[in-house]
């Protein structure tokens, strides 16, 4: 199972994130979407998570990827 970051209402996915400039690029081709590790998302319902992009983090003993800040983006499982 892959984890992608998808627009809540459109068929577009995050393709890449440039952390230096803050630019996020999107694609409508699911095969070009950035895939994230699924361990952090394993216990979450995709509709409850809002996303910006993912970056490594460690908090409260959990290691994984942190997502936040753009409500129209959601975690999407394939």
Language-model segments: what does each one mean?
Residues 1, 21, 59-63:
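Feature targets compositionally biased, intrinsically disordered low-complexity regions
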Residues 2-29:
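Short aromatic-glycine-(Arg/Gly/Cys) micro-motifs in beta-strand/loop hairpins
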Residues 34-78:
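Short, mixed-charge low-complexity intrinsically disordered segments
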